[in-house]
Amino acid sequence: MKRFKDMKSKWALILAFVMIVSVVVPAVLFSATDNVNAATGKSYDKTSLSYTGTYTDISLKKDADFKNAKYVSSSDEIISALQSAKAGDVIIIKGGTYKFSTSVIVNNTINGQDGSYIIVKAEDNHDVKFDFSAQVFNSQNRGFILDGDYWYFGGINFYGAGDNGVLLAGNNNIFERCVFEANRDTGLQLSRYDTTAATKDLWPSNNLIINCTAFNNCDFPEQGGTGENADGFAAKLTCGEGNVFDGCISYCNSDDGWDLYAKTATGPIGVVTIRNCVAFANGTLTNGTHYANGDMNGFKLGGSGVGTPHNVLNCLSFDNGATGFTDNNNPSALTLTNLTAWGNGKNAKKGNFVCYRAGSGAEYSGLISVNAVDSDKFMGNVKNSIYYNSKKYYQLSGDSFTQILNTSAGYKSGTVVNNPSSASGTFKNINNTIKYTDNIDELLRNADGTINMNGLYETTGSYSSMGAKFNVANQIVYVTGKSSDNDKETESSSENTSETTTAQETTKSDEPVSSAAHVMNFTTDITEQNAYFTISGNYSESKGSVIYNGMTLTKCLKIETATSISFTCDTDSELTLVFNSNFAKKIKIDGVKTAATNG
C-alpha cells in the first residue's frame, strides 16, 4: 500500500480514509486505526468492539526521541530518580537486573500531570528486571508501590516480591508491556495504599494496564501462604472507578487470572473494564505445580454479594482449573460481550461460565462455550450465544435478548447444537500447541505488544459473530503531550506468523488531539453528512477490494469529477489517506493537485 499525508489544515480531528481505485477511477473506503489523546482515558474508547488491541505512542518512540531523558544503571540511581521526578521527566533504565531487598515506594506527593506524564521505561531492545526475591514472604513486602498520579511504566519485569509485585494505588497511571512474574501474591493489584482512605472516591482510579503479562505468581503454602491469594491481576477490595485492563495475558498463577473481589466491610469497588485479554492455565504453575486451595478461575468478577456492574469484552479464557468467567456472587448487572471459554474446569469440575448469582439485568452477548466439563450457569439476559447445560449445548440466535431465569436450576432455552469444537469450519485453529514454559510474549504478541493468538479458538463461518478475536484493528493512545521533547511522526506494524495486518500509520501534532478519530466505512455503512464532513458522490462495489487491518473492504466512494468531501472543523489536525497499488498517485485537495508517494 501507499500512503499520502496531507499538510496540516484547520480540522478538529484526525480523519482516516482508505483509497482503493482502478486505473481509471479511484475510490474511498475506511481506515481502521483510531487516534486518540487518551493518556487519561478521556477519549480512549474502552467499550468498543471494533478494536482488538491498543498501544501507546510511547511504545513507538525510540530512546533518542526523548532528548532530555535521564539514564540510570543501578538500583540506587533508580530510587533516586524516582524520588526526585517531576512532571515531564523521562527516566530510561539501562538493560539489566536490579535487586531490591525492600519495597520501592513512590508516594502521593510525586506526580506527573495530565499531558505531562513522568515516564519510566526500559532501554530500547534491552530487558529490565526489578528483582525483589530477597524479600521474605510477608503481606508487607510489596515489591513496588505506586501511590502517585500520572506515571507511565514501560517494559519492566517486576519479579519475586514477598507480596504484590506492584501495588497500584494512584490515579491516571499507565503500565504498558510490563511483566509481573513469580511474586508471592498478586502480580499487579489495584487497591489503596493509605488504609485511612475510606471511600471509593479516594481509591485508585482511571488507571490503564495495557499489553502486560502476569504468570507464576504464587503464595506458596510451604512459605506460609495458602495458594489462593496470588492472582495474575487484581482490582479488588478498595479500587475506584475507571480502571481498565486492555491486551493483558494472565496465565499459570496459583489463584485467578483476574480477581475483582469485594467484601461487605469496605463495600462496592468501582466498575472495572477488562477487554482484549487472555487467561489460561490458572491454578497450575509453569512447572506443573498445582495447589488445590487456589480458586483457579480465568476471570473472577466479584465477591461476597457486594455488587459492581463490571464490563468484560472480547476476552478468551481456556484451560483454567475452575471457571472461565464467574460472577463470584456479584449481584449486579454485569456486561459480558464476545467471550470465548474453552475447556475450563478440569480441576474443580466447574462450567466455562458460572454467572447464576449476577443481577437479573446482566447482559451476555456473543458468548461461546466449548469443551465444557460442567453446566454453564446464568442469571440475566442472553443473546447470540452458545452455552452448555446438562450435557447439551444450546444456541440462542439473533439480536434479541432471552431472559435466562437461572440455568443452575435446570432452566434451558435455545436450539440444541453439537459441541462447537466438533462443527467443521467454525474455528480458525483448534490446535493448541502452547507450552506453559514458552516465552508467551514472544509467542502471542505482535511487535507493538498487542495480542495475536494466531487464530487459536477464533470463531469463523456461521459462528463468527460470537467469541473473542485478536489481531484485527488497533487503537493508539497518546501519552506524551508535553513529556516528550520530540513529538514526531511514528509508525507501527503488527508482525505475526500466520496472519498479516497492514502497517498502521499514526501522526502526532505539536498539541494533543482533542477527541477520537472519526472514520467512515462505506462497506458497512454510509453517512452522507455528520458534524465534521459532508460527502457527495457515487458508490460502487465493482472496483475491487482492499485488505486493511484484517478487514476486507469492498464498497467505495468513486472519485469522479462530481465527487467531493468537505470538512468543517476548527483546530489543527491531520488527514491520512491510504492508497492501494493501482491508484494513479494523484489527488486534488482544495483545488491543488497533490501526488502520493510511498510511505
Question: What does each of the following model-derived ranges do?
Answer:
Residues Y71-D76, G95, K99-S101, N111-D163:
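Right-handed parallel beta-helix/beta-spiral solenoid domain characteristic of secreted/periplasmic
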Residues R3, V23-K42:
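Sec-dependent signal peptide cleavage junction
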Residues Y117, E123-H126, D149-G160, N172-D185, ...:
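Right-handed parallel beta-helix
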Residues S103-N108, G115-I118, F132-F144, G160-L167, ...:
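Extracellular beta-strand/beta-solenoid scaffold signature
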Residues G53-I105:
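Acidic Gly/Asp/Thr-rich repetitive segments characteristic of extracellular carbohydrate-active
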Residues K42-N68, G227-E228, F233, A358-K488:
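Acidic, glycine- and Ser/Thr-rich low-complexity intrinsically disordered tracts
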Residues A39-T47, K482-S515:
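Ser/Thr/Gly/Pro-rich low-complexity, disordered linker/stalk segments of secreted
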Residues F583-K593:
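Short, surface-exposed beta-strand/strand-loop-strand elements in extracellular ectodomains
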